[in-house]
Amino acid sequence: MKVLENLVYTKTHEWVRFEDETTALVGLTDYAQQTLGQLVFVNLPQEGDETVTGESFADVESVKAVSDVYCPVTGVVSEINEELLDAPEKINDTPYEAWFAKITDITEKEEFLSPEEYEEFVKKEME
């Protein structure tokens, strides 16, 4: 399982890369994609959609199941990664480059885990 130092993480296995205080990219962690298995479909939010911290804003379908992806910030979707619509396997291949959406006008943030805290959280979850 790969965890990058320049990101923060959630207990629902999303990663967040802040570009500044009110703009962030959101994606699924390496652990999440490994657990889900080969992804075959992704449903992304629409540009202009409002997001709410802790609520589902996308979903992914693997050969095993359909899973919600939760937004760790409240804001507005300013851009989606359209490449994922045609190639959801990019989430499996390069999870930390395969961002789902850019969220701007962020007004609320989830309590995030540092890379070290996330690694510990996953270890406990795997026990």
Swiss-Prot record:
Keywords: Lipoyl. Residues 23-104 form the Lipoyl-binding domain. InterPro entries: Biotin_lipoyl (IPR000089), GCV_H (IPR002930), GCV_H/Fam206 (IPR033753), GCV_H_sub (IPR017453), Single_hybrid_motif (IPR011053). PROSITE patterns: BIOTINYL_LIPOYL. Its cofactor is (R)-lipoate. The keyword Cytoplasm does not apply. It holds the Pfam family GCV_H. Gene3D superfamilies: 2.40.50.100. The modification N6-lipoyllysine is found at residue 64. GO terms for biological process: glycine decarboxylation via glycine cleavage system. Binds 1 lipoyl cofactor covalently. The glycine cleavage system is composed of four proteins: P, T, L and H. HAMAP family: GcvH. Belongs to the GcvH family. The glycine cleavage system catalyzes the degradation of glycine. The H protein shuttles the methylamine group of glycine from the P protein to the T protein. PANTHER family: GLYCINE CLEAVAGE SYSTEM H PROTEIN, GLYCINE CLEAVAGE SYSTEM H PROTEIN-RELATED. This is Glycine cleavage system H protein. It comes from Lachnoclostridium phytofermentans (strain ATCC 700394 / DSM 18823 / ISDg) (Clostridium phytofermentans). The gene is gcvH.
